[in-house]
Amino acid sequence: MSKLTCGLIQMGLKGDTSMAPDRIRDRMIEAHVPYIEEAGRKGVQVLCFQEVFTQPYFCPGQDRKWYAAAERIPDGHTTRLMQEYAKKHRMVIVVPIYEEAMTGVYYNTAGVID
């Protein structure tokens, strides 16, 4: 039987909810990068992040502010960046984000990048 090495990164919010969603996203990604690199060094083959990992968990509410946090898959900022890390480390990365599938249509989803 083959062995599969998996990793999970979960952390608290780097900033606060009064900040703009793009600023929160940038801080969260910056905080994840060292752990992505560590996972790559340790030979992780499948790396997962927590739900809506670039933002606070706002999903139970209806605050329109968070619409600005939505990104496209596969062409959004976070997905494109994670494609680079997946390629660099030859790993699959599960990228849970708030997706804008089309104007006005939003999903709490995950892109799977290999």
Residue ranges and their predicted role:
Residues 1-114:
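Hydrophobic structural segments
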